[in-house]
Amino acid sequence: SYASTVLPKVKRVQLGDALAQRIGQLAGPYCSSPEGTHTAQQLADRLNTDRTLPLLVLRGQRTLPITLPGGKIILFENMLTASDDPAVTAGYILSALAAFDHRDPLRAYLEQAGPFTALSLVASNNLSKTQVDQLAKIALSQPQTPSPRTALLNLFSTAKISSSPFARVKAGTEGQGLIAQDPFLTGSPYPVLTDGAWLSLQAICSDM
């Protein structure tokens, strides 16, 4: 939509923050622990994406993370506990990035919200609490955009992480393609996280 293309970057970040806050109220609270939060940032830095990656974690299960305007990514607890290999969690984050680059999440949410919300955004660069609530509920309920395989594999290659561990938790042809075209078939050349850091991230929801 037009609204999604004209919104300044600073406003996208603000809108993403507002949506994250409302999603936390609707489906949270977000999982948090000093060690786990620190490790989440370590993992984001490890992915070599040259962009800020604010990561949030919610309890529950999803097949895909939620991406928000401005770049925030919401993971779900199953994405940390589905495997003993942190490359799987890295894969979920990279898949969210590939999907974000492929299709602006704001555009997807505004298409569902309808023209009135989009016009409000164009007119004022802001949304009412009711409209933020509407978009947050859309983000929670709408299936997220799948990531294009080639773009996802490029992100795995840049991060120097094997795509096979992530592929094994994905069903069907998507998983098969990520294994067949894994840029590191013999395994990730560098550890994704230390064992201690990985355990602290997996336990981020445990103390709540």
Regions flagged by a language model, labelled:
Residues 1, 55-63, 67, 81-82, ...:
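C-terminal capping/extension segments of zinc metalloprotease domains
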Residues 104-129:
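Post-HEXXH active-site segment of zinc metalloproteases
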Residues 7, 19-27, 44-48, 122, ...:
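Generic secondary-structure transition motif, activating predominantly at the C-termini of alpha-helices
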Residues 2-107, 193-197, 204-207:
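Peri-catalytic and regulatory segments of divalent metal-dependent proteins
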